[in-house]
Amino acid sequence: EEQKADILSRIKATDSSDDLEGCDLVIEAVFEDSGLKAKVTQEAEPKLVANGIFASNTSTIPITQLAGASANAENFIGLHFFSPVDKMQLVEIIVGEKTSDETLARSFDYVQQIGKIPVVVNDSRGFFTSRVFGTFVNEGICMLGEGIHPASIENAGVLAGMPVGPLAISDEVSMTLMQHIRD
């Protein structure tokens, strides 16, 4: 419990790039909007240490596209944490066209150090796992529309090996974000 408190005390959410001075790694997790992500990239990158990594938590926007806003595309990578983060073990590592092997290796090590399972994928819209989870969630919503009880849908998802059911995932991600991604 003490170790947990110590670690949590070192994590700081911020809306000021000044708080990022000297960071080795920044993981951007703003809304799925290329313009907003570009703004955050350009404000945060100058604060990183030399060779610092800037990662986007995007779930759908191609990393190569997002890296276009970066002054150091070789240090730009995708680290997509799945919701709910405390239950989902996978972290999708998305390599852009200019992402260096060193950035990939350091990112892979980071994901393992925090106790998650890294999955390296190539760059494409939706990557791999968002496509899989999209199907899982969409089918759960369709089943709900067909009149199947929500508890039965959730239970089936968990029995199939998922940490949570499709309706819980859609609630966690939000219908607004899912519609934005689809459109």
Where are these regions (language model features)?
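Conserved N-terminal Rossmann-fold NAD(P) cofactor-binding segment
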Residues: 1-24, 34-35, 39
